[in-house]
Structure formats: structure tokens, C-alpha cells
Amino acid sequence: MDRLDANVSSNEGFGSVEKVVLLTFFAMVILMAILGNLLVMVAVCRDRQLRKIKTNYFIVSLAFADLLVSVLVNAFGAIELVQDIWFYGEMFCLVRTSLDVLLTTASIFHLCCISLDRYYAICCQPLVYRNKMTPLRIALMLGGCWVIPMFISFLPIMQGWNNIGIVDVIEKRKFNHNSNSTFCVFMVNKPYAITCSVVAFYIPFLLMVLAYYRIYVTAKEHAQQIQMLQRAGATSESRPQTADQHSTHRMRTETKAAKTLCVIMGCFCFCWAPFFVTNIVDPFIDYTVPEKVWTAFLWLGYINSGLNPFLYAFLNKSFRRAFLIILCCDDERYKRPPILGQTVPCSTTTINGSTHVLRDTVECGGQWESRCHLTATSPLVAAQPVIRRPQDNDLEDSCSLKRSQS
């Protein structure tokens, strides 16, 4: 969100050396955000497996919002900050400020929706997740991420609601005494500061904390259940062991994904919390926060727009593979290996603690065949195809049965 870019009445501007350093830093931040978010969008569009994951719809929309922040907001802000002047007129100042509030709030809302999606995926039954996260509901959530921020951006800013009671202060701050020019100044009164900060940051932050806390508790319970299943299956037959191994892998994958998103949320809090705390405090202390503090907190928040793609690359294996394929021009080394005996999984109903149907792909006489069998899996784990090479007694029984039927 844009904030007062120059407090000329009580602060000195940046020196020549500082401007060169800042311009270099801003250029790196903007370039990193543009390339990184474009890479995320292209990766999901090209990778069919990434498109199958519902969470990635939010990630693509988030990348688009962060891309617009870099192109439409950061670039103009960097030019104004370095040159100590706003060239583009009062109307475009209002548009740019409104876009700033809209896009950064939309980015925060997307992170909140991602945390809720992961909560339903990990803490609820798979059937409950499918029923709740329908294509229609996902579309409504994505629409809300873009529409709701308009009510705290374009609507109040274009109507001047944020200026009520502080017009004189804004007029003093807009004028640059050194160059007889003006700045694009965005100041907010107390009601707008509280409303905007609560809607754009504090409510999403609270929802994310609650969601990730429940994810942590559920993942911890699942880890204990998996250990119990592994100990109980140590002396059992191979088929239950295979199911337990499959359940363990599934839960570890979900838990790792949750940890990745927790890191993303942690970076988001580190980047945006200083700004939103100051945004509420400043109107109550007569707007005495120094310009350079505002600049630092504002651009710390902007850095978050370029940080998310690199978090995906380093912490998410699927995205890392997709990025390598794109950057290495479809190098075959990074493509997913084909799955032998790939078939449609058996129809299952997954209920907490109930019996599930799993499909095994086994080798019989040099041919891969798919079969279904019942097994007890850990709670909240949906049945998926399992490929295994059966034991000798399995091969003997299954092949002899096939010969007798023929």
C-alpha cells in the first residue's frame, strides 16, 4: 500500500549516493518480482500435474496480483522516490494509489485463501474437502480476493474519504520546497487507517494463524497415527505394509506442503506487519513517523511480491521441477518419469478410520496388471494407485488363479 512518499516538512531527502543505491535495489526487487511471478504462471499453465491441484489456482492468481504490483505500483513509486517529483498528475496519483491498495490487499487475501484451502485439505475428510472446494466455490473465493479490496481502495480513495479532516496536512506534505514541485502523497485519517488495516491485514492474518495452527495439530496427530500403524504392521503381511507406506508418503507430502505455506505466511508477516502497525499508529501521533521509516516499511512489503515465487522454487518439489524444465528448455532429465501400468484408481469412499480400497499394479508373467484390495489406512488419507512388485507367494497365487480361470 502506498503511503506518504515525502515528509519534506520534517525530513531531508535522499542524497545522490543513497539514490543510486536505492535505484539499484528497487530495480532488482522489481525485476525479481516480474520474472519470478511470470515463471510461476507459466509453470502452472504448462504442467498438467500442477493444474490438477486446486491450491495452484490461488497461487496463479496470487502471482498475477504480485506481477501487477511490480509493474503498476513499484515502478512509479521508485521513479518518484529517486527523482523527488511526481510527473503524472493528480488523477493518475489517485489511480496509482488505489491500485496499490487494491493489489497488495488482493495479494494478502490470496494467501489467506491458500491457508483455508490447506486447512480443508489436511484437517477435514477428503470427501468434505471435495464438497467444500468445488470449482464454483473456488471461483467465488478468487472473485472475492479481487472484488472486496475495491471497497477499501478505489471507492474511498476516489471519493476522498481518507482525506476527511486532514486536508490541510496533506496540502503541506504535497509541496516540495526544494524543487517547487509536488509529490503523490497518500495520507489517511484515523477511521480509514483502522478500517483499511483491519480488513487488509489483521483479519486475514488471524484466519491464517488459526488455519495453520489447526494444520500443525492435525499433522502432529497424523504423524503419531502413522508411527502406530508402522509398528503394528511390522509383523503383518506385505499388502497392509504397502498401504501403510502409501499413507505415510501421502501424509508426509501434505505436511511438507503445509510447512512450505507456513514459511510463506511467515515471510508475509515479516514483510507487511511493520507497515500495518505503523499505518494505525501514525494518525494517532500526529503523523510524526519519519519519511525514511515509511519508505523502508513500504518497500519491505513490496519485497513480498517478489519473494513468493522463490519460496515455491526452493520449498516445493513440483514447482522446482517445473521451473527447471522451463529454464532448461524442456530438458528430459527434469521431466516426471512415466508410471508403469497407469490405470484408473478403484472407486473408494474415504471415511476417518474406515477400510479403504487401494489399487495395486503388480507384475505377473512379465505383464503389469492392476488389482484392487481392501486395507486399513490412516485417517484422512485418500486412496491412490500403488505400484509394487509382489512377493513370490503373491505371484504364485495370482498367476495360478489366472491359469485356472483360462
Swiss-Prot record:
Molecular function as annotated in GO: G protein-coupled serotonin receptor activity; neurotransmitter receptor activity; serotonin binding; serotonin receptor activity
One BP annotation, GO: adenylate cyclase-activating G protein-coupled receptor signaling pathway
Cytoplasmic-side segments: 45-54, 118-133, 213-257, 315-406
Transmembrane segments: 20-44, 55-78, 93-117, 134-157, 189-212, 258-283, 291-314
Compartment list: Cell membrane; Endosome membrane
Binding site residues for serotonin: D100, N279
GO CC terms: cytoplasm; dendrite; endosome membrane; glutamatergic synapse; membrane; plasma membrane; postsynapse
Presence of keyword Lyase: no
Glycosylated residues in this chain: N7
InterPro entries found in the cross-reference section: 5HT4_rcpt (IPR001520), GPCR_Rhodpsn (IPR000276), GPCR_Rhodpsn_7TM (IPR017452)
Domain of life: Eukaryota
Extracellular side: 1-19, 79-92, 158-188, 284-290
Subunit structure: Interacts (via C-terminus 330-346 AA) with GRK5; this interaction is promoted by 5-HT (serotonin).
Function: G-protein coupled receptor for 5-hydroxytryptamine (serotonin), a biogenic hormone that functions as a neurotransmitter, a hormone and a mitogen. Ligand binding causes a conformation change that triggers signaling via guanine nucleotide-binding proteins (G proteins) and modulates the activity of downstream effectors. HTR4 is coupled to G(s) G alpha proteins and mediates activation of adenylate cyclase activity.
Similarity annotation: Belongs to the G-protein coupled receptor 1 family.
Annotated domain remarks: Specificity for G(s) G alpha proteins is determined by the length of transmembrane regions 5 and 6 (TM5 and TM6).
Protein name according to UniProt: 5-hydroxytryptamine receptor 4
Gene of this entry: Htr4
